[in-house]
Amino acid sequence: MSEPRPIQVPSTDGVTVIAHDHGGIGPVVLLSHATGFHGRYWDPIVARLPQGYRYVAIDLRGHGDSIVPDGVSMNWRGMGEDVLAVVDALDAGSVRAVGHSMGGCAVIRAELERPGTIEAAWLCEPIIFPNDAGPARTTEGDSRMAETARKRREVFDSFDAVLERYGSRPPFSAVHPDALRAYVLHGFREQDDGSVILKCRRDTEAAVFEHAQTDTFDHLASVTAPVTVAGSGDGDGPATFAPGVADARPLGTFEYYGDLTHFAPLEDPDRIAAAIAAALGLD
């Protein structure tokens, strides 16, 4: 598969996001990533999707190769605005969309901000907290995930060192080799001394978790596009409220992947690509 073409896209708040354009002539399919990740981990999925479409994966603010001025908030409102900025830059009008975790919420935020933007969506455990989610419903400044992110190791001796470490322990030990390689090679940046450092720095990732959107669920009923929500066999967190997100939608469908985890798109690219193609009507 050829390398996608990176497009710099001005968004709100002085942010520049990156749209990785895989080319193709046809309707646009936009892919939106999880917190702490980037658009290029969708590469193995895109390679398995049908031809005849223009696949574009986005680096949301604070992630991948995006450019963010100092002091910009990681509020998830901005993530939805990043999606809209890419749709506008592509002159697409409306798109079919794929979203994972935070990226799923960003897709829905874009549709809520501008109805008609999303024709159909496939979302893996979108972070859209129901009102009864209890401790999982995070609020600004109060996030166990943020605390974990701030402890994350940022620097390794080399790309190979990252691949060896991540591939030998959960959760990445369950990830498909193609997806792990895409995540590492495009999620770290080489430094002058040859070491590599996370592109999404741990304080940025923590800030994203702390600003997790908490009111999106209340507006799901107004989203009229067909949305398929995928849930995994994880026993807590996003897996527990994924069915409720599907049920809150007029045209919501729920799919269950009991043998996969929250990292499902990285764990089984073949099966997930087939599910995306079916849900979005990609021939």
Positions of predicted regions on the chain:
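Conserved hydrolase catalytic core segment
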Residues: 94-136
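Conserved alpha/beta-hydrolase catalytic His-Asp/Glu region
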Residues: 153-211
